[in-house]
């Protein structure tokens, strides 16, 4: 069960002592399945970046900013930023870690995500390296977030199947109607596909391979590209599955008494933390076909 996994007790040294991205993907899927109200993904990725630094050993939780700081030194909408003691991110071309007091509150209407704006310059600040070193951490975040979205999708499907077996119309369960069956039949395949892509991306990240993007032969083992692919596909699947599940719940799907509304909101909110999906799609296209981009410039 989720409490038995002790997800929030992961120390900065855990990743370096044996936990792989694939291991963490399994735990992240469980966190998504139960909508764990903790910034597990952000903490796991950021803690790995701080491994071996004794001065940060007592910091918990830690997180990372997905976007570089603006001209005023502000990291916007940091996932886990409302509760994190340390934030890692890019500021003025450098990868930095900043320790400061978290605000303890988050903006409303953000799917209950503990996000917040944080300063990249106020607090105890340490330079960890060049901005380019953040690329791998961001890829790890995408893969683990994709895993949480797979967990959301899997539970949303279970809720739908359970409901259509319990809800009766015309004296029979609505799950016996062919239209309902057809609406749910294709979802397991989509969820399994997203899970497979997540674990493929995690395996490539764990291999530390530089990778390649041979789209002509469908031979892609570039960790950065696979991370984006896993994230985008899992986000799309989660939105589709939760939409279908909520639809078959009928009017009850919008009621707070039914859990599907929680999964519906978080499937969209968690996927948008990175930003507009179209931007990520364009970045992935540039990764696949960099010469096309250069030729158009």
Model-predicted segments: where are they?
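Alpha-helical interface subdomain recognition
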Residues: 1-34, 136-297
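FAD-binding core of flavoproteins
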Residues: 35-158, 162, 294-297
């Amino acid at each position: 069960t989720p409490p038995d996994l002790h997800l929030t007790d992961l120390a900065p040294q855990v990743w370096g002592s044996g936990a792989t991205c694939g291991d963490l993907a399994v735990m992240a899927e469980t966190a998504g399945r139960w909508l764990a109200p903790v910034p597990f993904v952000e903490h796991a990725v950021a803690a790995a970046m701080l491994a071996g630094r004794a001065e940060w050993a007592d910091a918990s939780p830690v997180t990372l900013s997905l976007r570089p700081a603006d001209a005023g030194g502000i990291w916007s909408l940091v996932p886990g930023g409302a509760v994190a003691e340390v934030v890692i991110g890019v500021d003025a071309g450098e990868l930095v870690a900043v320790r400061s007091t978290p605000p303890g509150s988050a903006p409303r209407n953000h799917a209950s995500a503990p996000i917040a704006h944080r300063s990249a310059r106020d607090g105890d600040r340490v330079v960890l390296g060049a901005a380019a070193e953040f690329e791998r951490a961001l890829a790890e975040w995408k893969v683990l977030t994709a895993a949480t979205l797979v967990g959301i999708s899997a539970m949303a499907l279970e809720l739908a199947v359970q409901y259509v077996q319990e809800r009766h119309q015309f004296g029979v369960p609505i799950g016996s109607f062919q239209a309902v069956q057809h609406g749910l039949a294709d979802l397991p395949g989509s969820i399994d596909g997203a899970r497979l892509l997540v674990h493929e991306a995690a395996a490539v990240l764990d291999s530390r391979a530089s990778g390649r993007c041979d789209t002509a032969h469908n031979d892609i083992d570039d960790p950065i590209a696979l991370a984006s692919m896993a994230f985008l596909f899992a986000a799309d699947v989660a939105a589709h599955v939760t939409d279908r599940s909520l639809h078959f719940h009928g009017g009850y799907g919008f009621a707070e008494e039914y859990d599907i509304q929680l999964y519906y909101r978080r499937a969209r909110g968690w996927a948008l933390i990175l930003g507009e999906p179209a931007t990520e799609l364009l970045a992935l296209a540039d990764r696949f076909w960099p010469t096309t981009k250069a030729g158009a410039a």
